[in-house]
Amino acid sequence: MHNIKVGTKNPFLSGRKRPPFEEVEAAIRTFLLWIGENPNREGLLDTPGRVAKAYRDLFTGYDESVEEILGTVFEEVSGYNEPVIMKDLSFYSHCEHHMIPIVGKAHIAYFPDEKIVGLSKIARVVNVFSRRLQTQEAMTAQIANALETHLKPRGVAVLIEAEHMCMTMRGVQKQGAKTITTSFHGSYEKDQVAQAHFMMIVRRSS
């Protein structure tokens, strides 16, 4: 599931056509029947179409390319020699096991070498990977790898904290439990002081 290369759109669809919208609506009607509902009652008549449109919006990450987002960089850092840190980047995703929401925040730092990127691009990278079926571990690694590949910084740090509705709504039903994952590259992997500085800023109250 996670063999999508950094910077590419979904290779699974290469040369393939997506099923038509009507087939998706029909599948959702079948699902409504399967759970014991009547898709012909007034409140559900338009639900299959609404659900299909909603999921089209929720999974836009399959249609976006990190390479395009990070393709424009600035090569003049004007003497800046410190990390760029963005915290509290809210996101939603869906777990690939149950297709149930994951809701959380991403905290990201990179140590520029010769390239910097607009701050909104970092947020868009998070959106690309979060708006796919995911595991939190894979998403953390994908964001870090994308920044390392395209910005070629001295170091990258990514920390994601999220609540998984598959643990909240079903199974063990532990409301409020959060999962934390990290990925450190370059100077952030080798330098414990830099890593500790990143963690301190992430944990500092706004």
Swiss-Prot record:
PROSITE patterns: GTP_CYCLOHYDROL_1_1, GTP_CYCLOHYDROL_1_2. It catalyses: GTP + H2O = 7,8-dihydroneopterin 3'-triphosphate + formate + H(+). Keywords: GTP-binding, Hydrolase, Metal-binding, Nucleotide-binding, One-carbon metabolism, Zinc. Its EC number is 3.5.4.16. One of its GO terms (biological process) is tetrahydrofolate biosynthetic process. Pathway: Cofactor biosynthesis; 7,8-dihydroneopterin triphosphate biosynthesis; 7,8-dihydroneopterin triphosphate from GTP: step 1/1. It holds the Pfam family GTP_cyclohydroI. Transmembrane segments: none annotated. One of its GO terms (cellular component) is cytoplasm. InterPro entries: GTP-CH-I_C/QueF (IPR043133), GTP-CH-I_N (IPR043134), GTP_CycHdrlase_I (IPR001474), GTP_CycHdrlase_I_CS (IPR018234), GTP_CycHdrlase_I_dom (IPR020602). PANTHER family: GTP CYCLOHYDROLASE 1, GTP CYCLOHYDROLASE I. Belongs to the GTP cyclohydrolase I family. Toroid-shaped homodecamer, composed of two pentamers of five dimers. This is GTP cyclohydrolase 1.
